[in-house]
C-alpha cells in the first residue's frame, strides 16, 4: 500500500491538503522536517501516513494527556494500532503496553516528554526499531514561546542515546521566527525540509467588541447559537465562575473549567464538552491545548489575552473542521492592568537567570502592547495577525487591505446598532442579568430575530447551510446517531465522523459500500464499523419523508 492507499484506507480521504504531501514525501525520503501549519490544516496526517509505511515505531512526543487520548482514540477508530504512555496509566498498564509494542502491535506510540527521561522507557527504546520521533506542539521547546515546557529540552539527549538516529519531525501551529530558530537548533534538525503553509485561517471570522455589558452580550449570543459548540475564555477563575453562574441561571447548557476545580471535576466537565453533552465551556486558558474537538463554532474571549500568540492559538480552536466559525474578543481597558499584573508577578523560571528573566518580562510587555494594538486597530484584523507572524497577505489592488471577513473590514450596521445596547453595564437590564423566565423568553425571541444580521458577517454561515431544509433534518438525525454511537464506544462524537463528513453524507445520500466510501472522511475501517448503521438511518429518514408526502 502506498501513501495514497494509506490516506484512503485508514482516513477516508482521496487527496492530501496543501503542504501535507511535501512533508510526507520528505519523511519517506529519510529527511527531518519542520511543519508550521495552522490549526485544522492536518498536521497529524503528515506524520501518521509515513509512520504506517515505515518499518519501525514512530514515537510522538505530546505535551498533554487529553491530546494523546484523543489522537490514539481517533487512530484506533480508523483501524490503526496506536497507544499512549503517560502518567494516567498504572505501572502494570505501561509494562503491558511496552510489551505489546516490542511484539510489533503498535506502529505509533504517543508519549509525554517526561517519560523519555525514565530508565524503563529508555530501555524499551533501545531494544526496538524507532523509525521516527515526532515532536508535536514543537513551540513548547522554546523559552521565548508562550507554552515553554522544560521537559522538551531533553528530547535531543534521548535521541542521542538510541542505537540509530531516527528521522525527527516537528510540528506547530504558531511560531515566530525566534521560536522557529529555537526548534531547529534545540532539536538539532539535520538539513530539514521546512514548510510554512501560512498562518491564515480563512474560515474564521475575527471580531473585536468595545463593550461594557459583556454578560448581556454573551447571554444573547448563546441564546442565538443554541445548537453550536463554543468556548468562552476568561482571564481569571473568578470571571469563569461569574459567567458560568449567569449563563447557568438563565437556563443555558454550559460547563466550566479552571485549575481551582478538582481533577475529577475538570475531567468530568471536559468530557461533557467533548462528548457534546454540554455544548459550551467557560474556561481559563488552562483549557484547550489538548482539545482536538473539530466542531467548535465560536470562541469568545471575555477578557483580552496576554499576547497574539495566545489569542491566535485559543481562537484557533474554532473551526478545526474547516467550516465557518467566529472568534470574538470583548475588549475593556481593565484587561491591560490584569495582564500587566500577571506578567510582573509571575513565578520565576528556575531554568533562567536574572538577566534572562528581565529580558523575558520586557518581551512579554511588548507582546501585550501588540495585543492591545490589535484590539484598537481600525485596519484589517486578519492582516494584523498575519503580519505579526511575519506573513504579508496578497493585496494585488494595493491600498487598504480588506479580508471581507472581520469586524473592521465588514461594517454591519445592524450589528453596530445591536452593540450599542451593550455599551453600558445594566443599560438594558438591571444587574445582575435577569433570571426571570419571561425576560429570557423575550431575549430568545429578539435574539433569534437579530441573529441573521447582528451576529454574522456575510461569510459567517453554519456548515449545514449548504443543505436544504430536508438535508438539515437528516444532518441532525445523523448527528444524534453519531452521539449515541460515541457514548456506546467511549470516544468523542467527532472521532466517529466529523460534521463535514456528515454533511457530505447528506449531500451524497449513500446506499451502498461504494457510495459510502466516496464520502470524505469514510475509510474502510470506519465503513466496516459504522457504514451500515448510518446508511440504515439515511434510508429510514428518506422512507419516512416519502410516507409523509404520500399522506
Regions found by a protein language model. Name each.
Residues 26, 301, 374, 504-505:
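Short alpha-helical segment immediately N-terminal to, or the first helix within
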Residues 1-3, 337-338, 347-356, 363-365, ...:
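Accessory DNA-binding and partner-docking regions appended to nucleic-acid-acting proteins
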Amino acid at each position: 500500500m502506498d501513501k495514497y492507499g494509506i490516506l484512503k484506507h485508514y482516513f477516508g480521504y482521496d487527496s492530501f491538503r496543501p503542504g501535507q504531501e511535501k512533508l510526507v514525501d520528505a519523511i519517506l525520503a529519510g529527511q527531518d522536517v519542520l511543519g508550521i501549519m495552522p490549526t485544522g490544516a492536518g498536521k497529524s496526517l503528515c506524520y501518521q501516513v509515513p509512520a504506517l509505511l515505515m518499518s519501525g515505531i514512530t514515537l510522538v512526543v505530546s505535551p498533554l494527556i487529553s491530546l494523546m487520548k484523543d489522537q490514539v482514540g481517533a487512530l484506533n477508530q480508523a483501524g490503526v494500532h496506536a497507544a499512549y504512555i503517560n502518567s494516567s496509566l498504572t505501572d502494570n498498564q505501561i509494562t503491558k503496553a511496552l510489551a505489546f509494542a516490542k511484539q510489533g502491535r503498535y506502529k505509533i506510540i504517543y508519549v509525554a516528554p517526561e517519560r523519555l527521561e525514565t530508565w524503563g522507557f529508555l530501555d524499551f527504546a533501545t531494544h526496538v526499531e524507532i523509525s521516527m520521533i515526532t515532536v508535536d506542539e514543537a513551540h513548547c521547546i522554546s523559552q521565548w514561546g508562550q507554552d515553554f515546557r522544560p521537559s522538551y529540552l531533553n528530547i535531543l539527549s534521548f535521541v542521542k542515546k538510541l542505537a540509530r538516529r531516527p528521522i525527527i519531525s516537528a510540528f506547530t501551529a504558531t511560531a515566530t521566527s525566534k521560536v522557529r530558530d529555537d526548534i531547529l537548533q534545540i532539536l538539532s534538525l539535520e538539513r530539514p525540509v521546512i514548510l510554512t503553509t501560512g498562518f491564515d485561517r480563512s474560515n474564521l471570522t475575527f471580531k473585536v467588541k468595545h463593550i461594557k455589558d459583556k454578560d448581556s452580550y454573551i447571554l444573547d449570543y448563546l441564546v442565538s447559537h443554541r445548537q453550536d459548540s463554543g468556548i468562552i475564555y476568561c482571564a481569571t477563575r473568578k470571571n469563569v465562575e461569574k459567567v458560568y453562574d449567569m449563563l447557568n441561571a438563565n437556563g443555558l447548557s454550559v460547563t466550566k473549567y479552571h485549575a481551582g476545580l478538582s481533577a475529577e471535576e475538570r475531567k468530568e466537565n471536559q468530557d461533557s464538552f467533548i462528548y457534546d453533552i454540554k455544548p459550551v465551556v467557560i474556561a481559563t486558558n488552562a483549557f484547550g491545548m489538548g482539545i482536538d474537538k473539530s466542531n467548535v463554532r465560536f470562541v469568545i474571549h471575555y477578557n483580552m489575552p496576554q499576547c497574539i500568540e495566545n489569542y491566535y492559538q485559543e481562537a484557533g480552536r474554532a473551526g478545526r473542521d474547516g467550516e465557518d466559525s467566529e472568534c470574538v474578543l470583548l475588549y475593556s481597558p481593565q484587561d491591560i492592568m490584569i495582564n500587566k499584573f500577571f506578567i510582573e508577578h509571575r513565578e520565576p523560571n528556575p531554568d533562567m537567570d536574572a538577566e534572562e528573566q528581565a529580558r523575558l518580562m520586557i518581551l512579554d510587555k511588548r507582546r501585550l502592547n501588540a495585543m492591545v494594538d490589535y484590539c484598537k486597530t481600525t485596519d484589517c484584523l486578519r492582516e494584523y495577525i498575519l503580519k505579526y507572524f511575519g506573513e504579508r497577505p496578497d493585496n494585488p489592488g494595493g491600498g487598504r487591505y480588506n479580508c471581507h471577513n472581520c469586524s473592521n473590514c465588514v461594517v454591519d450596521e445592524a450589528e453596530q446598532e445591536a452593540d450599542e445596547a451593550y455599551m453600558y453595564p445594566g443599560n438594558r437590564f438591571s444587574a445582575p442579568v435577569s433570571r426571570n423566565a419571561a425576560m429570557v423568553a423575550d431575549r430568545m425571541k429578539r435574539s433569534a430575530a437579530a441573529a441573521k444580521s447582528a451576529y454574522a458577517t456575510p461569510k459567517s454561515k453554519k456548515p449545514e447551510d449548504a443543505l436544504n431544509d430536508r438535508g438539515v433534518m437528516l444532518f441532525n438525525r445523523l448527528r444524534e446517531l453519531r452521539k449515541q454511537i460515541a457514548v456506546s464506544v467511549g470516544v468523542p462524537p467527532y472521532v466517529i465522523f466529523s460534521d463535514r463528513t456528515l454533511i457530505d453524507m447528506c449531500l451524497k445520500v449513500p446506499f451502498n459500500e461504494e457510495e459510502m466510501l466516496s464520502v470524505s472522511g469514510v475509510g474502510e475501517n470506519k465503513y466496516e464499523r459504522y457504514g451500515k448503521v448510518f446508511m440504515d438511518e439515511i434510508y429510514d429518514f428518506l422512507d419516512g419523508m416519502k410516507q409523509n408526502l404520500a399522506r
